[in-house]
Structure formats: C-alpha cells, structure tokens
Amino acid sequence: MNKTKLLLILVIVILTMGCIIPAAATPTPDLFATLQASTPSNISEPQVTQPIASPVFNLSTAAPTSITTSAQTPIPSPSSSDQPTGHIVFTCQIFKTQAAEQICIMNADGSGFRRLTTEDNNRHFYPSLSPDGQRVLYSSYLVDNNYEIYQMDIQSGGVARLTNSYGVDDAPEFSPDGQSMTFMHNSPTRNTNQIVISDQGGANAENIPRITGWDPTWSPDGKQILFASDRDGAVQLFTVRRDGSQIHRITNLPAIRGRSDWSADGQFIVTYSGEPWHRELYLMSADGSNVHQLTPSGGNSQGPSFSPDGKWVAFTAYFDKYNDENGCEIYIIRIDGTDLRRLTNNDYCDYQPRWGP
C-alpha cells in the first residue's frame, strides 16, 4: 500500500471519530434532599383508577450482606401468615410532566390506591400517618411561598395548617401516643436545620437544644429522637432525648442521606446509605451495632419505613427502571431480606413511603 492510500485512510478515521457524540450522563435524582420552592405549571388531572391492577410482584432477592460480625439481635423468622397489613402513605407525582407532587395512600398489599391531596399546582411531601391511622401529616407549599406542616383527616378530607413560620418545615411525624409531633425547620436567616417538637396541633413548638439535623423519627417509647446530621462532618445518624440531652452517634456508614425509621419494638433501626444510584437499605440494632445490608444490590433503594408489626420494611427503589428519573416505585421486603415485592407500577415516581395502621 503506497503512502497516498495510507494518508487517505488516516484522514477518514480521524473524521469519523470526530463525529461520535458522547452519550449524555443521566441526571441523578435526589428525592430526599431539602426542598426548594418552585411553582409547577398548570395541567389537567388524569383519571386515577382504583385499585392498582396486579399490585404485587415477587422479585428475586440476594442474601443480605453482613457488615459486622458481633453478636446480633435475633431477626424473627418469617411465617406465611405474616402478610403485610395496614396502610402506606407516600408522595406520588400523578403528573409525569410537572413537579406537582401529591400525597397518596394505599393498602399495604398495594391495593386501594387513593390520592389524598387535591391541589394540582402545589407540591406536597413527607407524609406520615397518625398512630390511629385517621390523620396524615405532610409538608406543603400552599401559601406564603413557604413549606409548612399540614394535617389532613383522611375520612373527611379536612385540612388544617399547623405551622406558620419563615423558612422550610418538612418531614413531620407523630409521636407514638399521637399527642406531639416532630419536624425539621430550616431558617433562611440562620441557614441551619433544626429539629422541632410541638403539640400535635402545632402549638408550643420548641427546638431541641444544641441540635442541628433533619428527618427526625421517634423512638417507640417517645423518649428519644433519631435524626440525621453532619454535626461531626460526614452525615450520620444520631439519637437524642427530647430535652437535648444524651446525644449519641450510632452509625458509621458512607453517604447517609436521612429518612430512617425505628421498629415498633425498639430493637431495630433501618436507614439507607450509598452514593447516588448505588444506595441500599441497612438494618441494625437500635444502638447502631450489627449492621446488615437489607436490600438486594442494584435497586438504588431509599427512604425506608417499618410496618407496624416490625416484620416488613417499605421503601423506594428503581429495580425495574434503573437510571430512569421517573422509575422509582414503592416496594416492601421482610426484615430478613426475603420476599421482595413491588406495590406500585406507574410511569411517574412514587416515593417517601410511611407505613401505619
């Protein structure tokens, strides 16, 4: 082959490589970060069919990964009679093309799907059920350009605004006796996240002293609060008594985000950890020992919540639509890492589940 032909081939190869456009990286959603206010566009509401057809899908599971080797709190063996009961509230997008998230509820087996909030152009997040299952707390961007805490009576649909503050109030949760609530308050003047405790109607609100953090969760006896914080540098989980005393760091996991839960018997805590698109659920003893990966790898699992009987965990994951921004669905799994089931099946995101009676 002469030099002219070689030169011609080299020119063609260079031109061809220059035409290849690198694939754009898929944006990584962060569904549990501190909320930023925005006003979604107007759009008509589609009809919602009730209940969801074929709600339960059994998926293959992997054995939970042991993180520690110390003596463990025994995990109850599953029984065929231990089927999920109660209700799960969660954030549902309803409209795939806009950001007007709503609050929805369904039975613990995925049936009986129902939308609770009705303001199409307002965003609603972080629902949680009352101990009697009759009310739901949530954060909403309804008036005054602020996220405030609201309470809805599920039976009547009546809504009451519980907070009226300057800043962001989110992640509310009822105390175990239903008489108080805790939530996170972010003050734009201080730019800090504070944990607040108030009466269940929003009165007598007080910050827990010396605490900065988010995503608070009550202990079953109502004496402690579990929360996420970067007070020691990297984000970890801490417990504190409601008067601000006895602060204990209980985790040493990489890239913890927040939303965690405490089992009703007080023995276990479940959280999630990991880099974007590689997050997993972890089960541990209440003091932070005996950490085990609960979910199979590859689902980008987030936002866990125990069932009232402590035998199941509800969470958000992308097992069926990995790397799809609209691919998050609600799943449940037994606390021994078996019997993974998908409860929702939509073309929009369902996330932030909270289990109740």
Name every feature range the model reports, one short phrase each.
Residues 1-2:
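N-terminal secretory signal peptides that target proteins for export/translocation
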Residues 5-23:
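Sec-dependent N-terminal signal peptides of Gram-positive bacterial secreted proteins and lipoproteins
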Residues 18-357:
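Sequence signature of WD/YWTD-type beta-propeller architectures
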